[in-house]
Structure formats: structure tokens, C-alpha cells
């Protein structure tokens, strides 16, 4: 069923899109340089070698839209009834850069730029801090700056950083800063590291089609099984794309995790205070980005609870009015739909 999309809450709720991307020209130019000089990993060559160089309509349109935080983006939000967009620097951010000083500078300048755009469109935009996990101590300070000086409402990290995952103890300063500020961490996909990408790349499955979700789901699962939520019980981690498959897998994840712990198969795998399902229901938040499919949305609400699922568009990578209508037309109670589209985001991002 088609209906006109308007902002302002005419259907009983505002629409807050929670995983929306932007880029800076410096960032795109940096990726191009890395692709050309051979310092990019295979995933960056595949993803940004295409988007930043292809003359195809999809690639050129996405770059144009990523670089625009002005009138075009506001117009697109108006056309699809999006009242507010929660913005973060597009993946992989500053994380692939081999020069740590350059990574810090790129991230800080992107944060300053985003803060200016949020200030200019305060009723439409919300910002998330980008960091350079290559330097965990600096990233911790930048999280605090983002929260307390720039007015940002969360932190986005684009999965692995040059093949390293956040369960490594070296990244603990980042989690200390998240605890100090009370901000959520959004783990956004990135292309898999070279150690994982081979079979995906040779089949064209390394990007958003499959590799993104598999790699990000792995990252979240590593964090859960490492005991991150036992060490930081108030921490909230967000993931997109209906939970990167973990809600569907969770019964078997719990069964096999508990079997491994009991058997002592992996000496480093320790008992947890809760089951994986319980952590999904207490510490993980899920957005619908790129997954405008009623069965998946309803299933995920059933698994993790209606308070833990939030709407997202995934602009500009997916920008379709009918995907907004799919959410509007879900056969759920009005109060549940308002949580999905508006009030869960207001709660968890402290809007």
C-alpha cells in the first residue's frame, strides 16, 4: 500500500533514521591514495576502488550524496518523511590508515565538520563521534570531546581496525571512555580483513551483500564471549542490518558456547554471567538498516524485545521510499511502531 511520506509525525510518530552516513573529501582522497599506492587492504580496493573511481550511476550518486550535508540531503529526508538522521562518518572511517597521526587528524577534522553541520541543522541532524582505534588513548579522549564539547550522542567504530578487534585488551581505554560518558557504541560493518576476505572476494560476496554482516556479527560475538558486558554491565552496543544475523543464530550460539565452556575445549573461553540471548536483551540494540523486510523485523522484535529495535535507512547506500512505507505498514501495535520509529532512538541516543 502506497501513501504519501511526510515529516512532522502525521502517522503518530516521528521517523528517526539511526544509521546514516556522510563522508569528507579528505577521507575519499585518502582512500584513493591508498588504493593507488598499494597500502589499501583487499577490502578497501574492492569497495573504495569501485565507489571512488567507477563512472557508474550508483557509484557517482553515492559519492555525491555522502559528501552533501546540505540542501540535497535535507530534501531527500523530506521526500521520504525522515524527521531526523543520526549521522556518522562512512565506513571504514579513519581505521585503515597506517599513519596513526594522519588517522587522528582525519577523524578529528571529520568530527569538527559534522559538529558544524549538526549546529546548522539542529532539528534534523544528530552526530556520532568517529575515532582512530589505532590510538586507543587518543580515541578515548576524542569520545569525551565528542560527548562533552561537540554534543554528539554516540560513537561509531567500523568493525575491525587493520585486522584487530575490540575484544583485545589494548582497546580498553575506549570502553572506559564509553562508560565515563554513558554513550552507546555503534559497530558498523567494514569489509573483512585480508585474513578472512579471500573466498568472499572471489565470489563477489565481500561487501554489503554478505561479507559486511558476517564480519560484524563475528565482531559482536567476540565481544560478548570475551565478557565485555560483564566488565561493563551498563554498556550498550548497537549493530545494524537486523543484528548481523545473531538473533537468528542465538539458540545455537548459546548451546555451543555453553558446551565449549563445559568441555574446556578452548582454555580462553570462560563462563559468562548471562547467556548470549540475555546479553542481546540487555546490552545490544539493533537497527533495521538495509533490512526493510517485515518477517525479519518482527522476528527480531520477538527475540530481543520491542524496546531494542530501531528504524534506520542506511542512506545513501539504500534510499527507497517504499522501504520507509514497509516500516509504516508493519502489522504491529501503534505503541510498538512508535518505539521502532521514534522513541527507542530518543531513549538510547539520549535525544
Regions found by a protein language model. Give the residues of each.
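Aromatic-lined substrate-binding rim segments of carbohydrate-active enzymes
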Residues: 74, 78, 101-108, 167-182
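Divalent metal-dependent hydrolysis catalytic cores, especially in the metallo-beta-lactamase
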Residues: 15, 57-61, 65, 74-97, ...
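Short glycine-enriched loops at secondary-structure junctions
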Residues: 133, 189-195, 315-317
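Mid-to-C-terminal alpha-helical segments outside catalytic/metal-binding sites
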Residues: 1-16, 23-84, 112-120, 141-145, ...
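Non-membrane alpha-helical structural segments and their capping/turn regions in soluble enzymes
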Residues: 67, 104-111, 136-140, 165-168, ...
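Surface-exposed, active-site-proximal loop segments in enzymatic domains
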Residues: 90-106, 137, 202-205
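Acidic-and-aromatic substrate-binding clefts and catalytic sites of carbohydrate-active enzymes
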Residues: 62-68, 95, 133-139, 162-169, ...
Amino acid at each position: 500500500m502506497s501513501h504519501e511520506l511526510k515529516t512532522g509525525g502525521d502517522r503518530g510518530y516521528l521517523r528517526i533514521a539511526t544509521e546514516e552516513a556522510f563522508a569528507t573529501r579528505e577521507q575519499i582522497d585518502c582512500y584513493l591514495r591508498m588504493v593507488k599506492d598499494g597500502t589499501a587492504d583487499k577490502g578497501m580496493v574492492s569497495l573504495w576502488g569501485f565507489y571512488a573511481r567507477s563512472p557508474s550511476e550508483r557509484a557517482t550518486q553515492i559519492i555525491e550524496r555522502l559528501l552533501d550535508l546540505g540542501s540535497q540531503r535535507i530534501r531527500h529526508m523530506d521526500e521520504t518523511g525522515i524527521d531526523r538522521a543520526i549521522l556518522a562518518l562512512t565506513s571504514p572511517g579513519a581505521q585503515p590508515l597506517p599513519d596513526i597521526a594522519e588517522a587522528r587528524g582525519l577523524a578529528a577534522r571529520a568530527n569538527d565538520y559534522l559538529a558544524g553541520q549538526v549546529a546548522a541543522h539542529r532539528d534534523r541532524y544528530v552526530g556520532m563521534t568517529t575515532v582512530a582505534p589505532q590510538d586507543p588513548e587518543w580515541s578515548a579522549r576524542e569520545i569525551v570531546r565528542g560527548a562533552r564539547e561537540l554534543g554528539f550522542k554516540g560513537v561509531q567504530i567500523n568493525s575491525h581496525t587493520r585486522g584487530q578487534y575490540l575484544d583485545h585488551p589494548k582497546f580498553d581505554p575506549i570502553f572506559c571512555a564509553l562508560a565515563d560518558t554513558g554513550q552507546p557504541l555503534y559497530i558498523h560493518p567494514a569489509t573483512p580483513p585480508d585474513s578472512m576476505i579471500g573466498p568472499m572476494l572471489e565470489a563477489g560476496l565481500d561487501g554489503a551483500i554478505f561479507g559486511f554482516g558476517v564480519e560484524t556479527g563475528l565482531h559482536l560475538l567476540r565481544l560478548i564471549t570475551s565478557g565485555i558486558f560483564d566488565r561493563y554491565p551498563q554498556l550498550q552496543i548497537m549493530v545494524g542490518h537486523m543484528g548481523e544475523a545473531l538473533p537468528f543464530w542465538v539458540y545455537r550460539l548459546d548451546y555451543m558456547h555453553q558446551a565449549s565452556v563445559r568441555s574446556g575445549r578452548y582454555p580462553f573461553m570462560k563462563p559468562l554471567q548471562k547467556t548470549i540471548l540475555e546479553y542481546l536483551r540487555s546490552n545490544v540494540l539493533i537497527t533495521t538498516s538495509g533490512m526493510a523486510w517485515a518477517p525479519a523485523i518482527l522476528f527480531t522484535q520477538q527475540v530481543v524485545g520491542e524496546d531494542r529495535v530501531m528504524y534506520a535507512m542506511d542512506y545513501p547506500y539504500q534510499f527507497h521510499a517504499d522501504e520507509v512505507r514497509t516500516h509504516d505498514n508493519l502489522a504491529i501495535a501503534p505503541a510498538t511502531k512508535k518505539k521502532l520509529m521514534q522513541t527507542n532512538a530518543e531513549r538510547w541516543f539520549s535525544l
